[in-house]
């Protein structure tokens, strides 16, 4: 909607002071933003975030502003049935990482925790089946679609952690799928997070592993 905007004004390092003063242009005045995901992973259809890769330098620039939030999200698993196995696994791990980091976030709330935990449960239950059977198991595809969106809703409000920060750099430098970069880092990040807050991290995941004694 705003071709006059300079991308350099939007793509800034996380600690760049300009982020505190730059006003993102008002969106939605010419058209409604309807997002229809075709993979079960990013949750972008319900988040205010975008990642833009600079083709010349390979740098991945994260952009965050609620003007980027779609007006409507249509979650229809029919658009996701024929994801290849590589996309299914990488995007599924991305969704799981969203849920885990939103749950561990210092900005987590009862609302985001509920979404993150249910997303985690469904991913553990249905990602292996979605990977193995693909379109032959539409229930698994639907559950993964819902899990991805729930994880997106969780981290849109609780935000993410250092796993995603490092995964963006790792993926850009080594040309890795984002979900694969997350998969390489998430265990180390969880161990790091568990050191000061073992009780909360012990809750991951309650379903195939023992329950934490307390929240």
What are these regions (language model features)?
Residues 46-158:
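Carboxylate- and glycine-rich phosphate/diphosphate-binding segment that chelates Mg2+/Mn2+
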Residues 173-215:
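Gly/Pro-rich interdomain helix-loop hinge
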Residues 1-78:
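Glycine/threonine-rich beta-strand-loop-alpha-helix active-site module
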